Swiss-Prot record:
Belongs to the phospholipase A2 family. Group I subfamily. N49 sub-subfamily. Disulfide bonds join 11-72, 27-120, 29-45, 44-101, 51-94, 61-87, 80-92. It is found in: Secreted. SMART domains: PA2c. This is Basic phospholipase A2 homolog textilotoxin B chain. It holds the Pfam family Phospholip_A2_1. GO terms for biological process: arachidonate secretion; lipid catabolic process; phospholipid metabolic process. The keyword Disulfide bond applies. Snake venom oligomeric phospholipase A2 that has potent presynaptic neurotoxicity. Chain B is not itself neurotoxic, but it is essential for the neurotoxicity of textilotoxin. Subunit B possesses a very low phospholipase activity. GO terms for cellular component: extracellular region. It comes from Pseudonaja textilis (Eastern brown snake). Keywords: Disulfide bond, Neurotoxin, Presynaptic neurotoxin, Secreted, Toxin. Heterohexamer. 2 forms exist: 2 A or 2 B chains, 2 C chains and 2 covalently-linked D chains, and 1 A or 1 B, 1 C, 2 covalently-linked D chains and 2 differentially glycosylated covalently-linked D chains. Textilotoxin was originally described as pentameric. InterPro entries: PLipase_A2, PLipase_A2_Asp_AS, PLipase_A2_dom, PLipase_A2_dom_sf, PLipase_A2_His_AS.
Amino acid sequence: DLVEFGFMIRCANRNSQPAWQYMDYGCYCGKRGSGTPVDDVDRCCQTHNECYDEAAKIPGCKPKWTFYFYQCGSGSQFTCRKSKDVCRNVVCDCDFKAALCLTGARYNSANYNIDIKTHCR
C-alpha cells in the first residue's frame, strides 16, 4: 500500500529525500501522470504507476491499499517477505523496484510541484 511504500522509500533512501517529497514531483509522482517524464525520478514513478496498473489486473487486487510485509535491514538493504497472496507479492515487488530506482535517481527540487499543464503534455 502507499503507506508501506513511503516507509520503503525511507528505508532505501536513508539520509536522502523524505517520501513526502515524491508525492508531488514531476508528471508521474503522486498522480496518474501524462506526457514525458521530466527526469529519472519521474521515470521511476511512471514505471511504478505502470506496475500498479498490472497488479490491478489480478482479481481483487487494489495496489494502493494492499498491505504487505517487508524487512528493512542495516544500510539501505530491504527485502519483501513472501506471502501466499499473489497480489501482496506483486505490490511489494512494485514498491521494492521503485524504491531502488528512486535511490539511484537524482532528485531535482525544481521538479517538485511543477505546473503539470505546462510540463506534462
